[in-house]
From Swiss-Prot:
Its EC number is 2.8.4.3. Binds 2 [4Fe-4S] clusters. One cluster is coordinated with 3 cysteines and an exchangeable S-adenosyl-L-methionine. One of its GO terms (molecular function) is 4 iron, 4 sulfur cluster binding. It is found in: Cytoplasm. It is an enzyme of class 2 (transferase). This is tRNA-2-methylthio-N(6)-dimethylallyladenosine synthase.
Length: 448
C-alpha cells in the first residue's frame, strides 16, 4: 500500500486543499497518509506565499527531501499551493529533483501529473487557472464526524496593495449554490456537526442557483445550510469588511447555528494606512460593522488580522490602531510586521521606519490584545460551554474541544468510550484559565 505525506503551510484554504489531495490520491491510487516523509512514497508540500521568505522555507524543505530521495529513488516530490503558482517552472529549475508542480486551481489534476511523471520521466508543471473546474473532479470528503471545511469560492478580486492572493489564486469565482449544499448535506449525513465555510473572501460569494439566472449571496447560503439536518454549528473564514452587508448581520440575528465568533480582518486603524493598503473602507466603517454585530449578538467575540510597520506608518497612525483595539476589544488575533511581497504595489513603497520601531509596535499591540484575550477567558470561568470534541490533547491523556467562541478547552475524559466522544458536542464547565487554553470538567455525556 502506497503512503502519502503532506506538509501544509498557511491558511485554512490550504488545509482544505491538502485534505482534498489526500482524498484524491486515496481514491485514485489507494494511498494512505503517513506522519513522516521517511515512510512516504509521495511527499507533497502545500505552500503559502503570504509571508516574507516563504520561498526560502520551501526550498529549505526541498533540500532535506533531496537527501531523502537519494536513499529512496522511487519517492515522488510534489510542490503545490501559492508558492508553486507564483514560481512555476522556476521550482524545477532550482530543484530538478521535484517531480510535479501544481497550483491551487489544478490540484484535481494531481493524479494525472504523477502518472505523466512516471510515464515520461520528466517533471510535470501545471499552474493554470481553469476557474473552478477542480470541484467537479474531486472525490467526496472522507470526513465522518466533528468539523469539516467546505470551500465555497476561490480567489480574491480586492487587490489590496500588499497581498499576493489575487496573483496566486486568481480572481473571485463562486461555486454553484446547489453544489455547496450537496457537499454540506453529504458531510452532515456522515456525522459532521460543524461546517466551516472557506474562501479568501467568503462574503463576496455569489453562487448560481440551479439552471435559473438567480444568484445566491452569502447570507442566503448560510440560511439554507442552517436548515440541513445534522448541521449544528456554522463558521466561516475569511471575510472582508467591504462586503460585510446588513443582510449578513441580519442572518446573525435569526440563525443561532451561526457561531458568536467573528474573524474580520481590519489590518489597521488609521484611514491613511487603510487607504495605502487599498482596503476600501475606513476605520469608522469597520467600527460600525462591529457595533451592529454586537447589537444582535452581545456575546460576540472578535478576532482579526493586523499589519504594523506598513510603509508610511507614523506614531500617530499606530496610536489610532491601538485606540481601535481598545475600543473594540479583540480576542486572539494574528499580528505581523509588514513584509513586502514581490509583484505587489506595496513592495515599491518607500519605507524608512527602522525595524526596531516596527518590532516595538508589534510587541505593544500583542500585549494589548493578549490582555483583552485574557479578560475574555476570565469571564468564561465558571460558565458551561457547548464544546465540539476534536480528539486527544497533545499530552495524550486529556481530551480537547472547541467552544463556540473558538476557544480550545481541555478536560479529563470519562472512564469508558473515549472514542465515542470524539466528534460529539458536550457541555463543559470551565474550571481553570491557562495561558493559551481553558480547562474544564465534563457536565454531559449523552453519547456514552
Amino acid at each position: 500500500m502506497k503512503k502519502l505525506y503532506i506538509k501544509t503551510f498557511g491558511c485554512q484554504m490550504n488545509e482544505y486543499d491538502s485534505g482534498k489531495m489526500a482524498d484524491l490520491l486515496h481514491a485514485d491510487e489507494g494511498m494512505v497518509m503517513t506522519d513522516t516523509p521517511e515512510d512516504a512514497d509521495v511527499v507533497l508540500l502545500n505552500t503559502c506565499s503570504i509571508r516574507e521568505k516563504a520561498e526560502d522555507k520551501v526550498f529549505s524543505d526541498l533540500g532535506r527531501l533531496r537527501e531523502l530521495k537519494k536513499t529512496k529513488p522511487h519517492m515522488l516530490i510534489g510542490v503545490g499551493g501559492c508558492v508553486a503558482s507564483q514560481e512555476g517552472r522556476q521550482i524545477v529549475s532550482r530543484a530538478p529533483y521535484v517531480d510535479v508542480v501544481f497550483g491551487p486551481q489544478t490540484l484535481h489534476r494531481l493524479s494525472d501529473l504523477i502518472a505523466q511523471r512516471r510515464k515520461t520521466g520528466l517533471s510535470q508543471v501545471d499552474i493554470s487557472f481553469p476557474e473552478i473546474e477542480k470541484f467537479d473532479h474531486l472525490p467526496a470528503s472522507r470526513q465522518t464526524r466533528g468539523s469539516a471545511y467546505v470551500s465555497i469560492m476561490e480567489g480574491c478580486s480586492k487587490y489590496c496593495s500588499y497581498c499576493v492572493v489575487p496573483y496566486t489564486r486568481g480572481e473571485e469565482v463562486s461555486r454553484p449554490f446547489d453544489d455547496v449544499l450537496t457537499e454540506v448535506a453529504g458531510l452532515a449525513s456522515k456525522g459532521v456537526k460543524e461546517i466551516v465555510l472557506l474562501g479568501q473572501n467568503v462574503n463576496a460569494y455569489l453562487g448560481k442557483m440551479g439552471d435559473a439566472e438567480e444568484i445566491a449571496d452569502f447570507a442566503l447560503l448560510i440560511e439554507y445550510i442552517a436548515e440541513i439536518p445534522g448541521v449544528e454549528r456554522i463558521r466561516f473564514t475569511t471575510s472582508h469588511p467591504k462586503e460585510f452587508t446588513q443582510r449578513l448581520i441580519d442572518v446573525y440575528a435569526k440563525v443561532p447555528k451561526l457561531v458568536s465568533h467573528l474573524h474580520l480582518p481590519v489590518q489597521h486603524g488609521s484611514d491613511s494606512i487603510l487607504s495605502a493598503m487599498k482596503r476600501g473602507y475606513t476605520a469608522l466603517e469597520y467600527k460600525s460593522i462591529i457595533r451592529k454585530m454586537r447589537a444582535v449578538r452581545p456575546d460576540l467575540t472578535l478576532s482579526s488580522d493586523f499589519i504594523v510597520g506598513f510603509p508610511g506608518e507614523t506614531d500617530a497612525d499606530f496610536e489610532k490602531l491601538l485606540k481601535m483595539v481598545q475600543e473594540l476589544d479583540f480576542d486572539n488575533s494574528f499580528c505581523f510586521i509588514f513584509s513586502p511581497r514581490p509583484g505587489t504595489p506595496a513592495a515599491n513603497l518607500s519605507d524608512d521606519t527602522p525595524y526596531e520601531v516596527k518590532l516595538k509596535r508589534l510587541q505593544t499591540l500583542l500585549a494589548l490584545i493578549e490582555g483583552q484575550s485574557n479578560q475574555i477567558s476570565q469571564k468564561m470561568l465558571g460558565k458551561t460551554e457547548r464544546v465540539l470534541i476534536e480528539g486527544l490533547a497533545k499530552d495524550g491523556v486529556n481530551l480537547q474541544g472547541r467552544a463556540e467562541n473558538n476557544r480550545v478547552i481541555h478536560f479529563s475524559p470519562p472512564d469508558q468510550n473515549i472514542d465515542g466522544l470524539i466528534g460529539e458536542m458536550v457541555d463543559i464547565r470551565i474550571t481553570e484559565v491557562l495561558n493559551y487554553t481553558l480547562r474544564g470538567e465534563l457536565v454531559e455525556t449523552h453519547v456514552i
